[in-house]
């Protein structure tokens, strides 16, 4: 039977243990390979300050690489009587290497250990989310260019308003995603700082080389103040959650639009049959369940920052077990958002648009502004032109001229998709993911 890392000469009540461990074993599986990476950097540093011999380091690194491979294969498990991922990794090392395995925790607490695990996990997941956002962005830009000349009604207050285009609609969500990358980039930069060496939040009497572990793990810098490093637990997750929520907000709005435009009363877009579901009683139904679930899941993600903030609310300086609860809402959120992004990209790619919407005369009044502007450009005062066209609409004598000429930046005739593409490319390049990727690869090859 495994012993707890903190175990004393008394037995813990099983119900207390069940309650305090909670779902930690399950959640810690997300962190397993990052716990290994953090340990590899930590023990390399320990050898450099004389707390491990070169021979001990070599044996530990070899075994940690084996454990990392087990994690990559999805075979890593936390045994029933083992408390968490940190205990499991140390137990596996001790079983293989004896007392050498017990040395890896010198100069480290589970507090800074889980902090570095969370940061390594999060920066990997942020990288993957950014990649999936880019895939959806590319689909939206492609559709925007494809349908840039196809007009559709624009709405305000859910009333027919002015001419828009499918080029504008698809392009608007592409630009929204480009802006969302700024929030994700800011969250990444705050995440990509090394907490190792802060121990339980008050540092260590060992002469730890924190810059060395920072470099080994590819962090941009470190959380310098050891007290602040511990205070960052929860704050980091909340900041990242806000960035995820921002992306989710774009998805939720887009999904709502798509559901509306797909319904028979609008008929602006059509989803392929394979992208819909049916009814058990109504044989004609083709429901946009994918977009409905994207909307619901995205709305759930938008509540994530508030959940984390409330768990952290009024906690003083230092570690508290409350923070364990953040794992349960934070760690799975990346899978949820990734799934939504993948489904959105797939269904946008398959979406067909109705190129003949404006054949319906019910949409003619939306060209009234075009007529007002034409009269004003010819010299009639704008208010007089507005009144004249309004009276024609009331009298039923208004005749819509559907040949519109919008040329300014970002309008129907000048989408500026090249500028939006450049914006996304600049925002993606600002992450500098390659530094972390190269550091991890190098660490694993030591």
Where are these regions (language model features)?
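A general structural motif at alpha-helix termini
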Residues: 60-61, 217, 273-275, 362, ...
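Generic, well-ordered alpha-helical scaffold segments in large soluble proteins
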Residues: 42, 63, 67-70, 92, ...
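Short, well-ordered beta-strand elements within core beta-sheets of diverse protein domains
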Residues: 44-52, 168, 238-246, 371-378
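Short alpha-helical "patches" and their helix-cap loops
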Residues: 55-60, 135, 184, 261-265, ...
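A helix-coil-helix interface module used to build multimeric assemblies
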Residues: 2-203, 208-214, 221, 277-278, ...
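Glycine-rich cofactor/substrate-binding loops
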Residues: 2-38, 99-100, 282-446
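Charged, flexible cofactor/metal-binding loops and thiol motifs
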Residues: 119-126, 130-131, 145, 153, ...
């Amino acid at each position: 039977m495994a012993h707890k890392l903190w175990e004393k000469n008394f037995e813990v009540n099983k119900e207390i243990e069940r309650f305090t461990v909670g779902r930690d074993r399950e959640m810690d599986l997300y962190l397993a390979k990052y716990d290994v990476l953090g340990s590899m950097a930590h023990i390399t540093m320990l050898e450099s300050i004389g707390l491990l011999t070169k021979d001990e380091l070599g044996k530990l690194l070899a075994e940690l690489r084996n454990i990392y491979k087990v994690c990559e294969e999805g075979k890593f498990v936390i045994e029933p009587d083992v408390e968490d991922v940190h205990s499991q990794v140390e137990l596996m090392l001790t079983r293989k290497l004896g007392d050498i395995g017990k040395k890896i925790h010198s100069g480290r607490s589970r507090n800074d250990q889980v902090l570095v695990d969370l940061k390594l996990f999060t920066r990997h997941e942020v990288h993957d989310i950014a990649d999936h956002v880019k895939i959806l962005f590319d689909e939206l830009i492609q559709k925007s260019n494809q349908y840039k000349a196809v007009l559709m009604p624009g709405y305000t207050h859910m009333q027919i308003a002015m001419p828009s285009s499918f080029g504008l609609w698809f392009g608007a969500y592409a630009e929204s995603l480009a802006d969302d990358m700024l929030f994700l980039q800011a969250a990444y930069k705050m995440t990509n700082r090394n907490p190792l060496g802060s121990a339980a939040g008050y540092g260590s009497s060992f002469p730890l080389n924190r810059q060395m572990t920072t470099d080994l793990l590819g962090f941009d810098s470190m959380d310098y103040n050891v007290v602040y490093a511990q205070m960052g637990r929860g704050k980091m997750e909340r900041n990242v959650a806000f960035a995820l929520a921002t992306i989710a907000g774009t998805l939720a709005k887009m999904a709502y639009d798509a559901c509306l435009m797909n319904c028979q009363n609008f008929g602006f877009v059509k989803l392929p049959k394979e992208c819909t579901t049916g009814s058990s009683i109504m044989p004609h139904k083709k429901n946009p369940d994918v977009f409905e679930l994207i909307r619901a899941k995205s709305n759930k993600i938008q509540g994530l920052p508030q959940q984390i903030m409330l768990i952290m609310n009024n906690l003083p300086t230092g570690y508290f077990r409350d923070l364990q609860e953040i794992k349960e809402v934070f760690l799975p959120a990346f899978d949820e958002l990734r799934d939504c992004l993948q489904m959105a990209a797939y269904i946008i790619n398959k979406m067909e648009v109705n190129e003949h919407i404006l054949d319906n005369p019910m949409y003619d009044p939306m060209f009234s502004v075009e007529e007002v502007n034409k009269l004003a450009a010819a010299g009639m005062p704008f208010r007089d032109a507005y009144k004249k066209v309004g009276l024609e609409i009331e009298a039923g004598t208004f005749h819509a001229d559907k040949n519109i000429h919008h040329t300014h930046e970002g309008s129907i005739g000048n989408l500026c998709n090249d500028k939006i593409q450049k914006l996304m490319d600049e925002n993606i390049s600002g992450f500098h993911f390659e530094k972390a990727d190269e550091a991890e690869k190098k660490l694993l090859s030591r």
